[in-house]
Amino acid sequence: FQVRAGGIPESPLAANRFPAGAVENYVAEEWSQVSNITVGAFRAPRSNFIAGAEQAFLDEVAEAAGKDPIDFRLELLTKAESKPVGTNNDYVASRYAGVLKLVKEKAAWSTNKNPDVFRGTAAYFCHNSYVANVLDMIMVKGKPVVQKVYCAIDCGIVVNPDAATNLAEGGLVDGIGHAMYSA
């Protein structure tokens, strides 16, 4: 269980961040990468990149294991709660699992098997909030088109629901735009 960060103050790469606590032999390394993606206007720029890399990797591991990507994450979170590896994880596994279960239900993940719809999922904990998404995409004239996004957020008590909705929707649009057009 080891983390090597690149010396960036307040790095989002943390020794106690998921999937820490759920897997043995965990190593996370951080380094700089030249990219054409601008970060000036990103919302929480360092966390976005870590989340994207982490979630893509978890999808690859789930696929290699022959497991559903949401169920795979839920298995890891169950292990992190019942038999944690290490101590002092900075997330609450049950809250993390809660947003995954909710987005799985709302998106009818297990039953929506339309072969023309490509689905993806991601979940992340950062800034004291748990977020899980399911994105449905179709191809139109050879180009990807986002059809629908499902989102579940557990950020604790929400004082201003409109502001929370605006932040979530703006973050989704920002992230989708960068993923589709900046890479």
Sequence positions of predicted segments:
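Active-site rim segments in enzyme catalytic domains, especially the processed small/beta chain
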Residues: 1, 10, 101, 157-183
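Glycine-rich loop/linker segments at domain edges
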Residues: 1-56, 178
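Hydrophobic alpha-helical scaffolding
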Residues: 9, 13-16, 40-51, 62, ...
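Short beta-strand elements
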Residues: 25-27, 131-153
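N-terminal leader/propeptide and maturation segments of large enzyme subunits in energy/redox metabolism
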Residues: 34, 38-104
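Helix-loop-helix junctions that connect adjacent transmembrane helices in secondary transporters/permeases
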Residues: 76-140
